[in-house]
Amino acid sequence: MVKLFKLKTMPVPAIRLSRLTKRYGNFQAINDVSLEVSEGDFVGFLGPNGAGKTTTIHCITGLSNFQAGSIEVFGMDVVKDYRRTRPLIGLCPQEFNLDPFLTIENILVYQAGYFGVPKIDAVKRARALLHHFRLDEKKNLDFRKLSGGMKRRLLLCRALVHDPKILILDEPTAGADLELRHHIWNYLQELNHQGKTIFLTTHYMEEAERLSKTIMIIDKGKIVHSGTKEALTKDQSLEKRFLELTKAAADD
């Protein structure tokens, strides 16, 4: 009797960048970057200011085009299959790009509706998120009436309201006080334990070490390290190099 063996298929990465290149005029923002993010991973994308972190995120989410290379989300090209890939991603940007003419509840409801969530479900999700982040009493205000920390929480709510498979966060705790920072950290860890893939940019080594399973370091548009958190923390020369990069960027 002939036995048939079932071939094992390799899991498709949640995010794959292949030789990504992005220029602004003569400035090389991203230089031939390749990386993979496994489904369910928590990646800390470290780098000093101006290293290329935000540009990488903008390329993944379709906010910026690029000159060469490719980006895939669960095996789908983000350019050719934009309408299929974009709903899979929740983006929490640095800037407060919120509509001042909507209440904060409606900001979330409209965001969910944009990604095809039925109105009744959108309202339920919006209210649940606002309650979790202690914003439910502010739901009828416009975002300009919120403090900086509240705006930061609202951006996270907006990124999550359509229940994406991937959560991309660009410096989500920038300007947050210690209490809010720890609240966000705990919530992100909970989401990751539930299976959500998280890609977080930061220039705080403490934040990356606390949250991440995988740490990648980018500098001057190139990946200079990619590996497990344990590998980075054991290699003191790598940690020292990152601190030097951060200090050099601050001194520029």
Give names to the regions the model predicted.
Residues 181-194:
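Helical segment within the ABC ATPase nucleotide-binding domain
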Residues 142-149:
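Conserved ABC ATPase signature
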Residues 109, 113, 120-138:
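Conserved ABC ATPase "signature" region
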